[in-house]
């Protein structure tokens, strides 16, 4: 997949570690990313690691990050951190100066940015990207923007609302109504299409 995407000359890709297998060692995770990067063979392509251990079952720790940066300093440039562990996120921003840490959580995005994080990559940004972008880009001017905290709370509320449903189905339902395009509702099991999203005020409202 990474090799095919690279053909389109994208600047960066977000890559999960190989998952399904339990008790994978750090060496195994490093070898997985090493093989992906070497087989793609694009010296210009940037890689953003994706740490979401509660879903993948694989945790990307300090040793993995450090070794991959040493092996591929021009390619491994950042990580989306979706573990929800704020202390760990802040340690990463402090320890790896040239490494871009992106919060995978809307509720933690502002705190991470204030402590050296690069921004946020979240599911919610598919439907409220402009709002999240404003929060991230203006976090240093928070005190001079009257409703800044309200905007942050709104972003979190959108996420909470989205995740009262199966999030991918809800995202697709929202986009199908927003763009009046039923192609958004194409979805594969075990995920199911949300029926009559126009009537679901929780999502559309």
Q: At which residue positions do the language-model features occur?
A:
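Helix-coil boundary/capping segments in enzymes
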Residues: 2, 98-101, 185
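Active-site beta->alpha loop and helix N-cap motifs at the rims of alpha/beta catalytic domains
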Residues: 1-59
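Alpha-helix initiation and N-capping motif
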Residues: 129, 168, 184, 199-200
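Catalytic alpha/beta core domains of metabolic enzymes, predominantly
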Residues: 39-45, 53-165
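Short, electropositive alpha-helical surface patch
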Residues: 4-12, 66-73, 178-181
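Interfacial loop at the N-terminal end of multi-pass membrane proteins
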Residues: 148, 193-194
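Long, low-complexity C-terminal extensions of enzymes
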Residues: 197-205
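Conserved short secondary-structure transition element at the edge of the structured enzyme core
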Residues: 113-116, 154-192
């Amino acid at each position: 997949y990474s090799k095919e995407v690279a053909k389109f000359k994208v600047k960066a890709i977000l890559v999960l570690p190989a998952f399904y297998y339990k008790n994978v060692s750090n060496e195994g995770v490093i070898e997985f990313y090493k093989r992906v990067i070497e087989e793609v063979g694009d010296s210009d392509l940037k890689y953003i690691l994706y740490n979401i251990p509660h879903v993948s079952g694989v945790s990307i720790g300090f040793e993995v990050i450090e070794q991959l940066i040493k092996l591929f300093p021009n390619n491994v440039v950042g990580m989306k951190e979706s573990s929800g562990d704020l202390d760990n996120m802040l340690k990463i921003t402090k320890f790896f100066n040239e490494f871009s840490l992106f919060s995978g959580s809307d509720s933690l995005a502002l705190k991470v940015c204030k402590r050296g994080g690069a921004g946020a990559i979240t599911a919610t940004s598919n439907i409220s990207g402009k709002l999240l972008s404003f929060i991230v880009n203006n976090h240093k001017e928070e005190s001079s923007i009257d409703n800044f905290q309200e905007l942050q709370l709104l972003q979190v509320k959108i996420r909470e609302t989205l995740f009262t449903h199966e999030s991918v189905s809800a995202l697709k339902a929202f986009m199908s109504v927003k763009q009046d395009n039923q192609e958004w509702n194409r979805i594969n099991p075990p995920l199911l299409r949300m029926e009559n999203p126009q009537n679901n005020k929780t999502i559309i409202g």
